[in-house]
Regions:
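SH3-family beta-barrel domains
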Residues: 5-33, 46-50, 65, 85-88
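Short alpha-helix capping/helix-loop boundary micro-motifs
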Residues: 38-44
């Protein structure tokens, strides 16, 4: 299952899953916080993703995100999948 599909828009009934890892997501906002852990209760790294395509290697549930948190392949940290669209 995916959190969202490119041609179908967001579907809040669907979830991202570790079974699908790794997968790519598109971020369309400039200031998506990168966090040190999976949740808004973890510290921000002080960096933002910017708009672009990113590879997610792990998914975890956590506070502040309905669809879960994705760990960036780059090692920069975790992003909320609520602001991502799966592209593959």
């Amino acid at each position: 299952m995916y959190g969202a599909e490119v041609d179908g828009g967001n579907d809040s009934d669907m979830e991202f899953s570790n079974v699908d890892c790794p997968f790519m997501v598109k971020v369309d906002i400039d200031d998506l916080n990168i966090r040190k852990g999976a949740g808004t209760n973890t510290a921000k790294t002080g960096r933002y993703t910017g708009k672009g395509v990113f590879t997610i290697i792990q998914v975890k549930s956590g506070s502040g995100s309905t669809l879960g948190w994705g760990k960036l392949k780059s090692g920069a940290g975790w992003i909320s999948l609520d602001y991502c669209v799966r592209i593959n």
